Structures are given as C-alpha cells and as structure tokens.
C-alpha cells in the first residue's frame, strides 16, 4: 500500500513590509495559473512586490517536489491571498528635537500550490494524462478568471 500525501503545499509570509493593495495587484494576476506560467508573469511584472512573491512561489514548488513525488510541471496556484495587518509605528527624528510618527503598512501573504497529477490514476497513459491535465487546468483557470 502506497502512502498518500497531500496534493497541496502552503507558503505563509507574515509581516511582509508592503501595503496589502500593492501585493494584491500582483497576487491577482497569478491566481489560478500554472507554476511555469506564474514564473514568467512574475519575472516581467514591474512592481516591487513581484520579486518576493516570485521567491515564495519557487520556495513552495521546491518544498512540493522534495516532500512528495510531485513534479513542478503539474503544479498550479489554487489559492493566493493577501491579508492586511496593523501598521508598524515608528518615529522619525525631525528638527529641534521633535519627531513625527510613521505608519509602515504590512501584510500577510498565503500561497497554495496544488499538484494536478494527484487527482489522476497511475494507470493512465502518459499522453492521456497530459491531455487530462491540460483540460483540468483550463477548466480551473476559467473559474479563477471570472473573479
């Protein structure tokens, strides 16, 4: 009997030092896409939040491939969310011994990668499996694009 593993890999980033709106505009573009497509999109986005999210996705994919038998080609982002966090409060020194308060916005980022091959039998031929994966991926992507 083979041991069943979870088809999902989670990555949490807490207290990420960027506002939730700025991180959310990057996350909204990658939600529901495949791992490879996500990497291409994140490399080309001009936003500051794109590179750290790129690192989170790569980290999740390496965790998925090392902890289970999933391949990076079969991964897609099933869930990606950004939650606001209370602002970090600092004091900035000013002239004449005064100080002004600074509120630095932060957020929590959650990314979930799901392995599509987990949902198929091992008895399926490789060419049929590729066609099934493509159909399932296109169906899931269609759901997320209607957000």
UniProtKB/Swiss-Prot annotation:
GO terms for molecular function: rRNA binding; structural constituent of ribosome. SUPFAM superfamilies: Ribosomal protein L22 (SSF54843). One of its GO terms (biological process) is translation. Its main location: plastid. Keywords: Plastid, Ribonucleoprotein, Ribosomal protein, RNA-binding, rRNA-binding. The keyword Ribosomal protein applies. GO terms for cellular component: large ribosomal subunit; plastid. InterPro entries: Ribosomal_uL22, Ribosomal_uL22_bac/chlpt-type, Ribosomal_uL22_bac/org-type, Ribosomal_uL22_CS, Ribosomal_uL22_sf. It is found in: Plastid. Pfam families: Ribosomal_L22 (PF00237). HAMAP family: Ribosomal_uL22_B (MF_01331_B). Belongs to the universal ribosomal protein uL22 family. Part of the 50S ribosomal subunit. This protein binds specifically to 23S rRNA. This is Large ribosomal subunit protein uL22c. It comes from Cuscuta gronovii (Common dodder). The lineage of its organism: Eukaryota, Viridiplantae, Streptophyta, Embryophyta, Tracheophyta. The gene is rpl22.
């Amino acid at each position: 009997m083979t041991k069943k593993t979870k088809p999902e890999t989670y990555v949490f980033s807490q207290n990420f030092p960027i506002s939730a709106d700025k991180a959310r505009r990057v996350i909204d573009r990658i939600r529901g896409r495949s791992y490879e497509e996500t990497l291409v999109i994140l490399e080309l986005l001009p936003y500051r939040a794109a590179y750290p999210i790129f690192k989170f996705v790569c980290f999740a994919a390496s965790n998925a491939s090392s902890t289970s038998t999933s391949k990076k080609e079969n991964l897609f982002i099933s869930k990606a969310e950004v939650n606001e966090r209370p602002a970090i409060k600092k004091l900035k020194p000013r002239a004449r011994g005064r100080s002004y308060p600074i509120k630095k916005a932060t957020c929590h980022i959650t990314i979930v990668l799901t392995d599509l091959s987990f949902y198929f039998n091992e008895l399926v031929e490789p060419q049929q499996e590729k066609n099934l994966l493509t159909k399932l991926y296109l169906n899931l992507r269609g759901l997320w694009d209607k957000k």
